[in-house]
From Swiss-Prot:
Annotated InterPro entries: P-loop_NTPase, Thymidylate_kin-like_dom, Thymidylate_kinase
Gene Ontology CC terms, in alphabetical order: cytosol
Family: Belongs to the thymidylate kinase family.
GO molecular-function terms, A-Z: ATP binding; dTMP kinase activity
Keywords: ATP-binding, Kinase, Nucleotide biosynthesis, Nucleotide-binding, Transferase
Record-linked CDD domains: TMPK
Protein species of origin: Desulfosudis oleivorans (strain DSM 6200 / JCM 39069 / Hxd3)
UniProt-listed Enzyme Commission number(s): 2.7.4.9
Function of the molecule: Phosphorylation of dTMP to form dTDP in both de novo and salvage pathways of dTTP synthesis.
UniProt protein name: Thymidylate kinase
Species classification: Bacteria, Pseudomonadati, Thermodesulfobacteriota, Desulfobacteria, Desulfobacterales
Reaction catalysed by this enzyme: dTMP + ATP = dTDP + ADP
SUPFAM superfamilies: P-loop containing nucleoside triphosphate hydrolases
């Protein structure tokens, strides 16, 4: 089984990921936890390029191709081998993020984005995508609080520094994907304390057919 977590900045998906893994392991899954960008050694180098604030002049096209390169390596060297071994892969962001960030928010040609995604993924799609949804204002408030706790400088946060309209387009893009693929997406209200959000996530997962592994 292949499960991905998606959401705008500050949606809380990374916070919920360990809770998700605990739930899956209690239901018989052997989990491999990964992320994009940066799920492989090569991918970690690409991640550094993508998130480096010194690269604030990176063109949208460059950004798109770097994400595609990261994903192509990730799918072929980690995701597909783990799935072939019968493991459950849990990934913090995947191809949907590229469609909404580079397509919806950056305004790149959507057909180009989708073609690159198909090549990079080799046609692999998640079985379940958990979309943690909340208004951008609330998500960015959380994100900046996390950044302050971690001692990062505001100038070091390339995506958080985008205008509010950018984050609104990201949210709209995710919700559009969820409307188009309701059989794959599970939309979770991400407002409120982490424990409450976790409860909503678990309740939603318990309704998913075949979530139990023999």
């Amino acid at each position: 089984m292949f499960i991905t977590l998606e959401g705008i900045e500050g949606a809380g998906k990374t916070t919920q990921l360990p809770r998700l893994v605990d739930f899956l392991e209690q239901h018989g899954h052997t989990c491999v936890v990964t992320r994009e960008p940066g799920g492989t050694g090569m991918g970690q180098k690409i991640r550094s390029l993508l998130l480096d604030p010194d690269n604030s002049d990176m063109s949208p096209e460059t950004e798109l191709f770097l994400y595609a390169a990261d994903r192509a390596q990730h799918v072929r060297r980690l995701i597909e081998p783990a799935l072939a071994e019968g493991k459950t892969v849990v990934c913090d962001r995947f191809a949907d993020a590229t469609e909404v960030y580079q397509g919806w928010a950056r305004g790149l040609d959507m057909e180009l984005v989708q073609v690159l995604n198909r090549v990079a993924t080799g046609g692999r799609k998640p079985d379940i995508t958990l979309l943690f949804d909340l208004p951008p204002e609330a998500g960015l408030k959380r994100a900046w609080q996390r950044i302050a706790r971690n001692g990062k400088e505001a100038a070091d946060c390339r995506f958080e520094n985008e205008k509010m309209a950018f984050h609104e387009r990201v949210r709209h893009g995710y919700l559009d994907l969820a409307r188009r693929e309701p059989e794959r997406f599970v939309v979770i209200d991400a407002l409120g304390p982490a424990a409450e959000v976790a409860g909503r996530m678990i309740a939603a997962l318990e309704r998913v057919p075949d979530i139990n592994r023999p």
